[in-house]
Amino acid sequence: AAKTVCVVDLPTLTGPPGNPKIPRFFKELPAVTLEQLYALIGPDMKAVDAVIRDRLYSDVVLVRQVAEYIINSGGKRMRPALVLLAAGALGYQGTRHHEMAAVVEFIHTATLLHDDVVDESDLRRGRDTANAMFGNAASVLVGDFLYSRAFQMMVAVDNMRIMQVLSDATNVIAEGEVLQLMNCHDADVDEARYMQVIHYKTAKLFEAAAQLGAILGQATPEVE
């Protein structure tokens, strides 16, 4: 039997008969590959990359060097893609999703910079980490720059719900980092605590990315 995934089924967004307030928007269809999903948003991903390059700019040379090094070090851009896919599924027609996708990538990249310093990592994705190349201090400070640049871009959108989602997400991510630090040498850590750490550290930003697309698409709270 073919594998299945849950995908948005746009014709059923109005909800089931008799209860239109509850959205009925998931349907089982044959599984799709990442390549097929990215093909749906190819032009949008190029637009996001252009926003990232533009908004990375700083008059401080070292900021540019470190930020460009980590941004260009590979990765699938899955979190930005999720913003674009969610917004597109809900019929969003503007360009704000490009900005928000870049914001999510900046936040993610900032966490990587900080992660590698905390973990004393020398390699990421087969390349020297930014802290191995430029030192811990530069990595931490450029991570801070990316966080603050992300919030500058957020404010420009002038949407309090978006600001709430992203500020909550960054706070939870920081808590996840501390939780991991507390438990990294604990051989008795249980499954519940492990799941809490990965929810805070990793899943929360994926959740926020999907929410941003829904907010831009003016989805109902139930869909969001």
Where is each model-derived feature located?
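Compositionally biased, low-complexity intrinsically disordered regions
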Residues: 2-3, 17
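Short, Lys/Arg-enriched N-terminal segments with co-localized hydrophobic residues
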Residues: 16-31
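Mg2+-dependent prenyl diphosphate-binding active-site environment of isoprenoid biosynthetic enzymes
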Residues: 36-47, 53-224
